[in-house]
Amino acid sequence: MYDKNQVTRCYDLAAEAYANRFFNELEGKPFDHNILTWFSRLIPGHEKVIETGCGPGEIARFLKDQGVNISGIDISQNMIKVAKRLNPDIDFSQGDMLNLKLENDSIFGIVAFYAIVHFTLPEVKLALQEFKRALKPGGYILFSFHIGSGVLPVKDFLEQKNADADFVLFQVEDIVKVIDELDLDRQEVITRYPYINREYESKRAYILLKKK
């Protein structure tokens, strides 16, 4: 089960190390670069997008530079401080993706790159249900996750003492089943192999959904 306090503490402790490690990682990930560019072209210029689990804001930064009207939330206050420092022109705030402070049918796009990695499958369903609630009809969700099975307990994440958290791997078919139960329109389900020596060596999935 998702331990909100543990995850918050982990990223509060690891915020600076995380930014140092990952803020510029898109430069070495052409697939991610391309899929985010593709997503940005689905968003009309006046519509708003929110990134959940934004970390230091590397995904929001990329989308902002593509002309997307984006903001970001993260459960970690320290991560939000880092994101604001690195991206002073983007609105970031502390928030919970399981309880978005958004009205029903109020936003056109939601991005969640590896933001579900601490959830169990039932909690993934809750997150997607919350995304659907906030999304305008015709709006999009783009999210990604590590493919596999089981839970990986991590101690001292990024060598930061007491930054502990459980990372969860998912099978694509299990996530797809959840999506279909929520009656979200699957636009694309794409997988890729890891970039060797550049990232954690798991296969990854990227899913684009549309609210009917």
Region roles according to the model:
Residues 184-195:
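Conserved S-adenosyl-L-methionine
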Residues 167-182:
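Short alpha-helix
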Residues 50-52, 56-99:
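Class I SAM-dependent methyltransferase SAM/SAH-binding core
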Residues 98-110:
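A short acidic, Gly/Pro-enriched loop at the edge of an enzyme's catalytic core
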Residues 1-44, 142-166:
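Conserved class I S-adenosyl-L-methionine
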Residues 125-137:
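A short glycine-rich, Lys/Arg-flanked "PGG" loop and its adjoining helix->strand segment in the class I
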Residues 195-212:
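Core SAM-dependent methyltransferase catalytic element
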